[in-house]
């Protein structure tokens, strides 16, 4: 897609956000007053449109590649609305995630719950964000033949994501800091459920449903996208430690938070006894000296090179899987996704 076309689609996409926001603050199911309307407006503007919007825009891109031609205004609106549903879902997860992780910044600004007038009201805001998704689906898709499948899809992916978050939280239980619990297979399970389904499978599944496809016939597409999601999360883990905070928009805290990160799992695999001891003694501690010791082990083990090797291998494997797919349109969708994340810096 030419860059001017994608800029045009992005501006249309952003306009749809305003329409959906207006629908929600005028929802007939609730009697809004000025205060509640202003709160919702501020909360939405702060949390929903601030990211890269990759997930949301991917629905529009994917639908366009499946259709193979220009989209009507109605198709642009509907695919954008589905894209925004994913961005809403993402906002709901992040608002609550930041509270659970006691994070400080998100997308280059303070986390929503860190704002003086917000605090724990953010927990209810997260619930509201989650409840906005079915409101949007009902208003704009209720008459569509794929409506029930859409509702099912969002419910299932939300369940998978929340369950992935649970494995992440109980594996990283503070007070039970036991690095020996961490392995590549646990890392993979967390990633698959917590990130891959909603970030990678969901946008393409939305486009496929809108295009009239049966998701049961696209299991292979799901598998490739889950693999892509795993690769994406490994990049994220890498950038948390090695990325520049001003570029990635947040200060990485995976080491302090005792996260089951790809880096620590790889380090444990490659480390000698002394390095393992250093990791066991310092991983998950908040003080800068401990964090520095963990990073020193990462540098000594040359995890940057190990990651680059992983990135190259993953890319090759993904391209091979994609090119095995019988449909050129589906191949284009998957390649477009991979192109967006390969060698990303943020």
From Swiss-Prot:
<dbReference type="GO" id="GO:0004337">
    <property type="term" value="F:(2E,6E)-farnesyl diphosphate synthase activity"/>
</dbReference>
<keyword id="KW-0414">Isoprene biosynthesis</keyword>
<keyword id="KW-0808">Transferase</keyword>
<comment type="similarity">
    <text>Belongs to the FPP/GGPP synthase family.</text>
</comment>
<dbReference type="InterPro" id="IPR008949">
    <property type="entry name" value="Isoprenoid_synthase_dom_sf"/>
</dbReference>
<feature type="binding site">
    <location>
        <position position="194"/>
    </location>
    <ligand>
        <name>dimethylallyl diphosphate</name>
    </ligand>
</feature>
<feature type="binding site">
    <location>
        <position position="106"/>
    </location>
    <ligand>
        <name>dimethylallyl diphosphate</name>
    </ligand>
</feature>
<dbReference type="GO" id="GO:0005737">
    <property type="term" value="C:cytoplasm"/>
</dbReference>
<feature type="binding site">
    <location>
        <position position="259"/>
    </location>
    <ligand>
        <name>dimethylallyl diphosphate</name>
    </ligand>
</feature>
<feature type="binding site">
    <location>
        <position position="233"/>
    </location>
    <ligand>
        <name>dimethylallyl diphosphate</name>
    </ligand>
</feature>
<comment type="pathway">
    <text>Isoprenoid biosynthesis; farnesyl diphosphate biosynthesis; farnesyl diphosphate from geranyl diphosphate and isopentenyl diphosphate: step 1/1.</text>
</comment>
<feature type="binding site">
    <location>
        <position position="195"/>
    </location>
    <ligand>
        <name>dimethylallyl diphosphate</name>
    </ligand>
</feature>
<feature type="binding site">
    <location>
        <position position="97"/>
    </location>
    <ligand>
        <name>Mg(2+) 1</name>
    </ligand>
</feature>
<feature type="binding site">
    <location>
        <position position="101"/>
    </location>
    <ligand>
        <name>Mg(2+) 1</name>
    </ligand>
</feature>
<dbReference type="InterPro" id="IPR039702">
    <property type="entry name" value="FPS1-like"/>
</dbReference>
<comment type="pathway">
    <text>Isoprenoid biosynthesis; geranyl diphosphate biosynthesis; geranyl diphosphate from dimethylallyl diphosphate and isopentenyl diphosphate: step 1/1.</text>
</comment>
<comment type="function">
    <text>Catalyzes the sequential condensation of isopentenyl pyrophosphate (IPP) with the allylic pyrophosphates, dimethylallyl pyrophosphate (DMAPP), and then with the resultant geranylpyrophosphate (GPP) to the ultimate product farnesyl pyrophosphate (FPP). Has a 4.5 time greater affinity for GPP versus DMAPP.</text>
</comment>
<dbReference type="GO" id="GO:0033384">
    <property type="term" value="P:geranyl diphosphate biosynthetic process"/>
</dbReference>
<dbReference type="GO" id="GO:0046872">
    <property type="term" value="F:metal ion binding"/>
</dbReference>
<feature type="binding site">
    <location>
        <position position="107"/>
    </location>
    <ligand>
        <name>isopentenyl diphosphate</name>
    </ligand>
</feature>
<dbReference type="InterPro" id="IPR033749">
    <property type="entry name" value="Polyprenyl_synt_CS"/>
</dbReference>
<dbReference type="GO" id="GO:0045337">
    <property type="term" value="P:farnesyl diphosphate biosynthetic process"/>
</dbReference>
<keyword id="KW-0479">Metal-binding</keyword>
<feature type="binding site">
    <location>
        <position position="250"/>
    </location>
    <ligand>
        <name>dimethylallyl diphosphate</name>
    </ligand>
</feature>
<keyword id="KW-0460">Magnesium</keyword>
<feature type="short sequence motif" description="DDXXD motif">
    <location>
        <begin position="236"/>
        <end position="240"/>
    </location>
</feature>
<dbReference type="GO" id="GO:0004161">
    <property type="term" value="F:dimethylallyltranstransferase activity"/>
</dbReference>
<feature type="binding site">
    <location>
        <position position="101"/>
    </location>
    <ligand>
        <name>Mg(2+) 2</name>
    </ligand>
</feature>
<feature type="binding site">
    <location>
        <position position="55"/>
    </location>
    <ligand>
        <name>isopentenyl diphosphate</name>
    </ligand>
</feature>
<feature type="binding site">
    <location>
        <position position="97"/>
    </location>
    <ligand>
        <name>Mg(2+) 2</name>
    </ligand>
</feature>
<feature type="binding site">
    <location>
        <position position="90"/>
    </location>
    <ligand>
        <name>isopentenyl diphosphate</name>
    </ligand>
</feature>
<dbReference type="Pfam" id="PF00348">
    <property type="entry name" value="polyprenyl_synt"/>
</dbReference>
<protein>
    <recommendedName>
        <fullName>Farnesyl diphosphate synthase 1</fullName>
        <ecNumber>2.5.1.1</ecNumber>
        <ecNumber>2.5.1.10</ecNumber>
    </recommendedName>
</protein>
<dbReference type="InterPro" id="IPR000092">
    <property type="entry name" value="Polyprenyl_synt"/>
</dbReference>
<feature type="binding site">
    <location>
        <position position="52"/>
    </location>
    <ligand>
        <name>isopentenyl diphosphate</name>
    </ligand>
</feature>
<feature type="short sequence motif" description="DDXXD motif">
    <location>
        <begin position="97"/>
        <end position="101"/>
    </location>
</feature>
């Amino acid at each position: 897609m030419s860059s001017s076309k994608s800029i045009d689609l992005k501006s249309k996409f952003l306009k749809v956000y305003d329409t959906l926001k207006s629908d929600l603050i005028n929802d007939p199911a609730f009697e809004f007053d000025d205060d509640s309307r202003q709160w919702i407006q501020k909360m939405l503007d702060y949390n929903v449109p601030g990211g890269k919007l990759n997930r949301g825009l991917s629905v529009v891109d994917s639908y366009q590649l499946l259709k193979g031609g220009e989209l009507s205004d109605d198709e642009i609106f509907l695919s954008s609305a589905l894209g925004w549903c994913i961005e809403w879902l993402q906002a709901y997860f992040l608002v609550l995630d930041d509270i659970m992780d006691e994070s400080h910044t998100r997308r280059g600004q303070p986390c929503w719950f860190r704002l003086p007038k917000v605090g724990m009201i953010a927990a209810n805001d997260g619930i509201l964000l989650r409840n906005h998704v079915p409101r949007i689906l009902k208003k704009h898709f209720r008459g569509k033949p794929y409506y029930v499948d859409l509702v099912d899809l969002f419910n299932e992916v939300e369940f998978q994501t929340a369950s992935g978050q649970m494995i992440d939280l109980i594996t990283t239980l503070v007070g039970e800091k036991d690095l020996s619990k961490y392995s590549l297979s646990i890392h993979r399970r967390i990633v698959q459920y917590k990130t891959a389904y909603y970030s990678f499978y969901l946008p393409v599944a939305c486009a496929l449903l809108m295009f009239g496809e049966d998701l049961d016939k696209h299991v292979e597409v799901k598998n490739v996208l889950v693999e892509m999601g795993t690769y994406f999360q490994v990049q994220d883990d890498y950038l948390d430690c090695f990325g520049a905070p001003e570029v990635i928009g947040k200060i990485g805290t995976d080491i302090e938070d005792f996260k089951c990160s790809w880096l620590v799992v790889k380090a444990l695999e490659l480390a000698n006894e002394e390095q393992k001891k250093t990791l066991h003694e310092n991983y998950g501690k908040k003080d800068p000296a401990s964090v520095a010791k963990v990073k020193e082990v990462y540098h000594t083990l040359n995890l940057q090179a190990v990651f680059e090797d992983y990135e190259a291998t993953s890319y090759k494997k993904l391209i091979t899987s994609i090119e095995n797919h019988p449909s050129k349109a589906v191949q284009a969708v998957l390649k477009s996704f991979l192109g967006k994340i390969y060698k990303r810096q943020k």
